[in-house]
Amino acid sequence: MSAVTFEDSGTPLKKSKNRHGETSEEMLRRMCRDIAKDITDAKQQDYIDQPRKEITASEWMEGVYDIRYIVDREKRYYRAELMVAGGGPTIWVNLNSKEVEGYWGSDRVTVPFTDNLGLDEYCEEMYGC
C-alpha cells in the first residue's frame, strides 16, 4: 500500500487525473487560460473542430450564468464580476482586477486578461437600463 501525501493544509494531495491526463488544478488552469484568451483576442471557438471567430461583448455575455455588479454608495456602476462556470469548477471574470478567477475544491487559479471585448462598458450600459 502506498503512503498518502498531504498538503500544508492537512488535506490529501490530489494526484488523480482526468481522461486527458490533467489534474483538477491543471484543468482549471486550462479553462481559465482559454476564457482569458477569448476575452483578450475578442474571438471564441464554438466547437473544437471549427476555427475561432470574432465575437461581440453581447455574444460573449450569452454564456454568462450570473452578474455581480459592484457599485458605489450612491449606486453608480463601478465594475462587475461575471460567473462563467459553476457546479464543478467555479469561474468568475473579474472586470475590476482584469483576472479570470477559478476555484475548484482547494485549487485557486488567476489568469490576467485585457478586455478587448468591451465587457466593462457593456456591463455599465446594461446596469444603466
State the predicted function of each range.
Residues 2-84:
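Negatively charged, low-complexity tracts enriched in Asp/Glu with abundant Ser/Thr
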Residues 12, 23, 65, 90, ...:
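Compositionally biased, intrinsically disordered low-complexity regions
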Residues 18, 94-96, 116:
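Detector for Asparagine
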Residues 40, 47, 51, 94-96, ...:
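Generic alpha-helix signal with a bias toward terminal, lower-confidence helices
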Residues 74-109:
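Acidic, low-complexity, intrinsically disordered interaction modules
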Residues 98-129:
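Polybasic, proline/glycine-rich intrinsically disordered low-complexity segments
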